[in-house]
Amino acid sequence: MNYKDRIVCFLDILGFREHVFDSVGADGSDSVTKISELAAVFGRIRETLDIDCPENRPDTEVTQFSDSIVISFPAYAEGGVFDALSGIMRVQINLVLGGYLCRGGIARGRLIHTPTMLFGPAMVEAYTLESQAAHYPRVILDAEIINAGVAAHASHHLPSSEQQSILGLLKRDLDGMYYIDYVTGAQSELDDPELDYPNYLFKLRDIISSRILSNNPSVSIKYKWLREKLVDHLQTVKQSARNRPQGDEIRDAYESIPDL
């Protein structure tokens, strides 16, 4: 058995420990509502990533255990980077809609990832990126992953077009790391981009406002980062919506979002 050259993403759902504790009442009884909520979140993730339909993703392996998700695919897979980043963004969107956030790291290297085994230097690197470098609710990667995606561009794309498509899913942060832009870039991934996006931003705003005042600095700093990514964008889209007629459904939806 030999390692394969693969690109791997390690995702961790933030605050999952507390959500699990909340699924058991003070009297020791199960909270059926909370357990059902957690199960629904994982159900949406499994559906998004085709975890239960491996025939739909022949080059991609996906493993989910507790609050962690690992996705990997051959580094040479045509269009693999773009497809993976799109899938990860959809996972982030579904988590937000359920009231959750995640953090992650994407690395390239030697890996064995089968339905029964998962190990290798690339896995260690992806986990290290998530746990020691991501810091905030973001999924980070460096230029090496972008370059790999361009080199293995989809057959219907020129390399320059593939690069443009990949960069369209990303933002570059102040520390130089690229991250998947699930704040301003999420609209096109929603079922009804025009109508669903105000609700999505409302959910993001609620997540931030409910946790940004945490007494734990390591928690509050995560939501302060997210607030910085959302606050100006929220003002921009709300101002744009005011160009619509009074009583317009979309205008009303944006105006219903409280400021941060």
Could you say what each language-model-derived stretch is?
Residues S68, S72, Y100-T114:
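A short glycine-enriched loop-to-beta-strand structural element that forms part of the catalytic core
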